[in-house]
A protein has these predicted regions:
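Internal helix-loop-helix
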Residues: 1-46, 83-90
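A short core secondary-structure module
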Residues: 79-122
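A structural signal for short hydrophobic beta-strand segments in well-ordered beta-sheet cores
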Residues: 67-68
Length: 210
């Protein structure tokens, strides 16, 4: 849309937590929407995505992080890897609430986990692209029962809905980013004059055409 196009042309950093906001608008309770969406809109609360695990990368249905109901709370135990927004205020976390469910994805639920909750250990790791991700360990992390997003054991619908929205968001952003980069390249090629112009080079013209 126009907003994303303008952001990419300005080379502005991406802000907010659009993926989690969309999931809350689709599956969250009115109370959750009132509590979390305004802070996301203001850019005051980033939400990470706690999906992948050591034994559950591309096969998210194999995740083992557990959530067990304990009165008015859920107890979270497990490990998440490759988490990029580990420094966010909240984690949008997938956990298993029925270890015997068949098929396995039928026993997954989604939660909002405050990242300042006791029992969370964060171990950041540097990457080759000068960014960081983190291994995050959850050890008897207690969260309120109302932090469940969607229905118990129906988190696969929430999770896949969030992933589908992310594909559209990221894919559209990449197309706009490439288009902007091409326009910058074209301007650079056309900027010179005479012998200094790259536009007259056959190889450059061929590469630009393809």
């Amino acid at each position: 849309d126009l907003f994303m196009e303008t952001m990419e042309q300005a080379e502005a950093p991406r802000i907010g937590a659009a993926i989690q906001a969309n999931a809350l608008m689709m599956f969250g309770t009115p109370e959750q929407q009132q509590q979390y969406l305004p802070a996301i809109l203001r850019g005051e609360a980033m939400h990470g995505m706690g999906y992948s695990e050591p034994q559950a990368g591309s096969d998210l249905a194999a995740l083992r992080t557990s959530a067990v109901r304990d009165g008015d709370h859920w107890l979270i135990n497990g490990q998440k890897i490759w988490t990029t927004t580990w420094w966010g205020k909240y984690m949008f976390l997938a956990a298993r609430t029925d270890k015997d469910a068949k098929p396995p994805h039928a026993g997954i639920s989604m939660f909002i986990v405050p990242m300042d909750a006791p029992g969370i250990t964060i171990r950041p790791s540097a990457t080759m692209y000068d960014g960081t991700f983190a291994n995050i360990f959850y050890d008897n992390v207690r969260i309120p029962a109302e932090n469940l997003v969607g229905e118990v054991n129906d988190g696969w619908k929430v999770l896949t809905g969030a992933l589908a929205f992310e594909r559209g968001l990221v894919g559209g952003g990449i197309v706009l980013k490439v288009a902007h980069a091409f326009e910058q390249l074209r301007a650079h090629v056309m900027a010179g004059e005479g012998d200094q112009s790259l536009a007259g080079e056959p190889i450059v013209r061929d590469r630009m055409a393809t």
